[in-house]
Every structure is written in structure tokens, then in C-alpha cells.
Amino acid sequence: MINIGLSGSTGKMGKTIIEIIDQFKDCQISGKFNSTNNLNDLDNLCKNSDVIIDFSTPEVSEKLINYALKHNTKLVIGTTGLKDQHFKLLEKAAQTLPVLYSANMSIGANLLNYLAKKITKILDEYDVEILEMHHRNKKDSPSGTALMLASTIASAKGFNIIFNRDNRIKSKKEIGISSLRGGNVHGIHEIFFLGNDEIITLKHEALNKNSFAIGAIKSAIWIQNKPSALYSMQDIYKV
């Protein structure tokens, strides 16, 4: 039985993981951490768990990584809004233990990322723009998934990523990200490939949080026998 510690247990993702964990017979929730706990409680969470699934905040994730290193606890990080300092810490941790990070753990979003990379290389002369939409209470903007998609396309094209075009026209070598917030939207991401005579659109829409939670739990199971390294969902889904 795999003991999974859950960081961010009272958030939308944490609650969904708790609701569906019984679908997986080879793992169980061994401990929970939420915003009402003291950050030092992460010590016991790591000590009593084989792997931690983290959907919390950048501040909590940073503390969690340090305790995971102390107890050699595997990590599955889905927290968004991380900065360079956090990614450097993830890379450091991955030298000692297996770590999986992804801004989106659904198979659909990762397939979208795969298709975007393939199409980008074919549609070399097309402009590319990304639109993402989430519920009114989402804290980070643009979303981690939008940044993942933009980074994939930018790497393939050699483009820059921008978030604001006040009083200037679009440059040929840039990808713009637009964010909408409202209602109870779980997550919509659209990639527009804009040519002179046609527009090609790729779209992924999450109907609920289940696909993200399933991906997180599968990641926690998958990572058990893996060597120390920094993994992504592409390693699991082979895309």
C-alpha cells in the first residue's frame, strides 16, 4: 500500500483527490496538510508518507521540498504560481529523490501540449496566441497550463512570451497569452494558429477537477520505483 500525504487538502484539488482516492486500491491518504496547519507540520507529513501530492501555495511548496529532502519523500507537485527560486529548488531536490512537477496533470491538457509542439513546427509562418479561462477565484494569472503551452511553442519557434500589448502592434516573433476570470470555470485553454487565409484552433476544456486528480494519483503511483530525477507528465503519458 502506497501512503500518500496530501498538501493542500482543503483546496479544490485536495478535496477532489480525497473524493476519488478509493478508486485506487493500491494507495491511501496517510496524512493531510492545509492552510490552518503550522508549516512545521509538513515535517510529520513527509515522515509518514511515501510520496506527497502538493496542491498548495508556492510558500508551502518551498517548505515542503526541504522536509521531503530530509525524509527522502517522493514528490508530486501540482502547485502553480511557482517562481524561478522554486524551480531551482525542485531541480536540487531531484538530484536526491524522484520529483514530478506539472502545471496540469490531465491527459487531455498534456496531449494538447504535445499537439501544439507538432503543429507549431509545421505552421511556421502562422501567428500564435493563447487564451485561458478559469473561475473567478483563481489566484495566478496567466495559468500554469497556459505558461506550459506557451513555453512549449516558444521553444519550438524561438519566440518571446508576452502578457501585455498596450499601445503597440504585435511582433512577428511573440506569443501572447490572454486571461479571462469568471464564474465557476474549471479550465479552458485555446491555442490559435492565425494565418492570412485561415485559423486553426486547438482547445481543451476541463469539465471538472477529476481528470487533474486522477493524473496526480497516477503520478504518485508511477513515481514509486523511479530513480532520482525531475519528471513531467510527458514521461508518464509518453507524449
UniProtKB/Swiss-Prot annotation:
Q: Which GO terms describe its cellular component?
A: cytoplasm
Record keywords: Amino-acid biosynthesis, Cytoplasm, Diaminopimelate biosynthesis, Lysine biosynthesis, NAD, NADP, Oxidoreductase
Recorded catalytic activity of this chain's protein: (S)-2,3,4,5-tetrahydrodipicolinate + NAD(+) + H2O = (2S,4S)-4-hydroxy-2,3,4,5-tetrahydrodipicolinate + NADH + H(+); (S)-2,3,4,5-tetrahydrodipicolinate + NADP(+) + H2O = (2S,4S)-4-hydroxy-2,3,4,5-tetrahydrodipicolinate + NADPH + H(+)
Task: Please give the pathway this protein is involved in.
Answer: Amino-acid biosynthesis; L-lysine biosynthesis via DAP pathway; (S)-tetrahydrodipicolinate from L-aspartate: step 4/4
Q: Per its UniProt record, what PROSITE patterns does this chain match?
A: DAPB
Q: Which residues bind NAD(+)?
A: G8, S9, T10, G11, K12, M13, G78, T79, T80, S102, A103, N104, M105
The UniProt record lists the EC number as 1.17.1.8
Sites binding (S)-2,3,4,5-tetrahydrodipicolinate sit at H135, G144, T145
| One Pfam family this sequence matches | DapB_N
Q: What is its EC class?
A: oxidoreductase
Protein location: Cytoplasm
Keyword Cytoplasm among UniProt keywords? yes
The active site consists of H134, K138
Which family is it part of?
Belongs to the DapB family.
Which named protein is this? Answer: 4-hydroxy-tetrahydrodipicolinate reductase
